[in-house]
Amino acid sequence: MRGIAFVWQFGEVILAIALAPLFSGWIAQCRAWMQNRTAPPITQPYRMLRKLFNKDAALAENASRLFRTVPYVLFATMALAAAIIPSVVTDLPFARAADAIALIGLFATARMFQALAAMDIGTAFGTLGARREMMIGFLAEPAILMVFFNAFLLFGTTALTSMVDNYATHPSVIDPSVVFAAIAFIMVLLAENARIPIDNPATHLELTMIHEAMVLEYSARHLALIEWASSLKLFNYACIGIALFIPWGIAIHGAHVGAVLIALSALLVKLAVCGAVLALIESVSAKLRIFRAPEFMAMAFLITVLGLLVHLLLGANTGA
């Protein structure tokens, strides 16, 4: 049983790495359909990655080893995060060594290294993007921590695998505070992954750039790894949302191969729905001014606080 657990573990990581560009391509395709535009092929991210990997890297003369190493660090960090998230099965050996708080720390580590690399060259755009990225992260982390704290009050644990197992063994555990947490989580997902209304990865206007400003100096394999890591981060956030709010179908400990195949099919359906929802949100939303981002993240934080208050009030009434 121990050996099969490691098979599921590495299988989930490989699955996340392989499906992440496809998930990004699906979102781009859905957004194009909703905006009445010709949709790019769903495999377009793979083609872009292949083209970038086939090019020769061009680096600035004053680029340090940090600048060259950060793309690999970002990709490895996102792959490690994928090993902690129960997207298909909960029997994950690596997940026992880290909980949701450690997962937030991994994302923060990746953000820190990317900001340092953006400032390493000394360009104005890189420094601008790094400062804005750190500001967004500083505002988003309290909200996502409150989301996980909400889950902790429900299940008494911050381990994602234990949360999913609790959902499976206690399917009647439904709390209105989960709705507030889900709304706040979607807002954090949009902010942390450079999506509209916080950021627009398709633009290169200096007044609106955040993520793109940090990667302007990268090319070839380095840019490919950064783009792949960005897709993997979005995929990881989607899987976190699935594990927290719609975990039904995920195979629990001791599941057989048939249950894992069913869980894989359920994951693909959930990802398709999540991608369509994200595309809809981006299609009906307008890009916010950078100075409005703190208000957006403050709203996410307050929504989670309201969810906690609802949970505590309902718990007090139930106890009474």
Q: Where in this protein do the model-derived segments appear?
A:
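Interfacial loop-to-transmembrane junctions
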Residues: 277-304
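Juxtamembrane boundary at the C-terminal end of a transmembrane helix
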Residues: 307-320
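Cytosolic juxtamembrane amphipathic/interface segments immediately preceding
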Residues: 48-67, 123-128, 215-222
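Juxtamembrane inter-helical linkers in multi-pass membrane proteins
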Residues: 36-53, 200-222
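Juxtamembrane/interfacial segments at transmembrane-helix boundaries in multi-pass membrane proteins
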Residues: 150-180
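Alpha-helical transmembrane segments
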Residues: 8-23, 95-108, 171-192, 262-263
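Mid-bilayer segments of alpha-helical transmembrane spans in multi-pass integral membrane proteins
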Residues: 102-117, 138-155
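Transmembrane alpha-helical segments that form the membrane-embedded catalytic/substrate-channel core
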Residues: 21-30, 108-118, 183-200, 272-283
